[in-house]
Structure formats: C-alpha cells, structure tokens
Design a protein with these regions (language model features):
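A generic structural motif
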Residues: 28-36
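Short, small-residue-biased leader/transition segments that mark boundaries at the very start
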Residues: 1-2
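Short, glycine-/small-residue-rich phosphate/pyrophosphate-handling segment
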Residues: 36-37, 87, 96-136
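Active-site-proximal loop->helix
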Residues: 7, 75-77, 82, 97-106
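Short catalytic helix/loop segments, enriched in acidic residues and glycine
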Residues: 10-29
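N-terminal small/polar loop signature for handling phosphorylated ligands or for N-terminal nucleophile
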Residues: 39-63, 67-83
C-alpha cells in the first residue's frame, strides 16, 4: 500500500493510504470500535504486530497482505494463532486477475475475504469484522 500511487490506478484507484486510514478511523468511531492502522513493507514486522494482537485484546484483524497473500506462510502462521475474526482485504478482485493471484494462503484461516471494491473494501471489511467480533 505504501507505493499505491505508483501502481495501476485502474486496479487500485487514486485514494491514498492516509485517506483510507482516516475513513477507517471515522467509521470505527461510528460503529463503536477503536481502529489501529498499521502498514509496513517488512514481512517480519507484520508477523510481530499480529503476534501482539494475540495478547493485547484485539477484537478483529483486517489484513491486506498484498503479494504476501499468495505465498507468506509466516504471515499465515502468525494469523492462525489468533482467536479473533480475520478479514482478508484486496482492493482489486484477485480472482479476476492473473492466475497466480487467485490463490491465497490466508483465506483458509480467515473469517472472510473482501475483494474488488477499491478503497471501499476496507470499509466493508471493518463492518464485517465488527459484526463478527460482536457475535464471537
């Protein structure tokens, strides 16, 4: 997400990560949920943040793992220890793109996957996560 502006706007739109984060925080307040946004290009940092979620009372995790979706067993294994709902997010429809993007190592352990709605994928995922956490 850090270099979204350098990627194909037809796939990812033109909204910035800061704008998505602000929309998530605002929607979280509306839904009565505290939202923490985290972004890194370092796989180990994602795994460490996920491990922290295991012990800090995180009620749900939204994750857009980008290309790591297709091959990162480290991120998958970190997510697998969580007891809270996990929602996998993709701005583009990964199932309508190149064949190598169709497979997700995260999907089998996620509560659900939201893809193809651009930046709205994040907002839809937050609504789903809040609902799932309330039912858990």
């Amino acid at each position: 997400m850090l270099f979204r502006s350098k990627r194909d706007p037809a796939q990812y739109g033109t909204v910035t990560l800061a704008e998505i984060d602000a929309q998530l925080i605002a929607l979280g307040k509306e839904l009565g949920a505290e939202v923490e946004c985290f972004q890194t290009n370092i796989e180990g940092e994602i795994a460490e943040r996920i491990h922290r979620a295991h012990s800090d009372g995180t009620a749900a995790v939204l994750i857009n793992a980008g290309a790591w979706t297709h091959y990162s067993y480290g991120i998958r294994d970190a997510l697998a220890i969580l007891k809270c709902p996990i929602i996998e997010i993709h701005m583009s429809n990964i199932h309508a793109r190149e064949a190598f993007r169709h497979h997700s190592v995260i999907a089998p352990i996620a509560k659900g996957q939201i893809a193809g709605f651009g930046a709205d994928s994040y907002l839809l995922a937050l609504r789903a996560a809040v609902s799932a956490a309330q039912q858990a």
